Design a protein with these regions (language model features):
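Long C-terminal interaction/binding lobes of large macromolecular proteins
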Residues: 1-205
């Protein structure tokens, strides 16, 4: 994976106008790794690549803001990209979930799955369904639509265990009211916000 130059980044920024955050992340990773298919990576592997690209572009340190959900106070916070990279082997392939009398073969979600699931109101369940390769109950094949809700709950938790990089949250604290909360950190949206600010600044100079 390489770090694209300034001219390439400006061109990418210009032609990505109007695209969704996921599509923008895919364009960026395709530019950095033209030989691969970034949309086919698990969400964790995709985000790990985005974290590393962010460090190459802007360095390891970052800052952000959030509004306290309790009192509305603006909270400023900062961190280090390297602290958000999960240690351990990046997993791919087929996994097996044993849930009571059910045996589920599944893979980890990727960006294709996220884009497909976005079309449904209950996108979380559709995302899980897309990743089930085979479902059996007492050695007989069964339809994914017939699986009970608790099996989907177990599958959701198991996917989170297998791909922890896919769900990064920051523990924030409000200095005004002392409220603490966890806020999801979406590296794709954050990185593109930085690229957008950088591109506009370059064009003004």
């Amino acid at each position: 994976m390489r770090a694209p130059g300034a001219a390439e980044m400006l061109d990418l920024w210009d032609r990505s106008s109007g695209k969704t955050p996921i599509e923008k992340s895919m364009e960026l990773l395709s530019l950095a790794s033209p030989e691969g298919d970034p949309a086919g990576l698990s969400i964790g592997r995709r985000d790990a690549c985005l974290f590393r690209l962010r460090e190459r572009f802007f360095g390891p340190l970052f800052s952000n803001i959030a509004d306290c959900p309790s009192c509305g106070e603006r909270v400023e916070w900062s961190g280090n990209i390297r602290d958000l990279l999960v240690d351990g082997e990046e997993k791919e392939g087929v996994f097996t979930l044993y849930a009571a009398s059910y045996v589920i073969l599944f893979r980890l979600p990727n960006s294709y799955d996220l884009m497909n699931a976005a079309a449904y109101r209950d996108h979380s369940e559709w995302l899980l369904r897309d990743c089930i390769l085979e479902a059996r109950k007492q050695d007989a094949y069964c339809d994914v639509a017939d699986l009970p809700e608790d099996v989907f709950d177990l599958l959701d938790r198991r996917m989170a265990e297998e791909d922890p990089q896919a769900d990064i949250s920051m523990l924030l604290s409000c200095a005004k009211c002392a409220h603490q909360w966890e806020m999801p950190f979406d590296i794709g949206s954050y990185l593109w916000m930085e690229i957008d600010s950088w591109a506009k600044r370059v064009l003004r100079e």
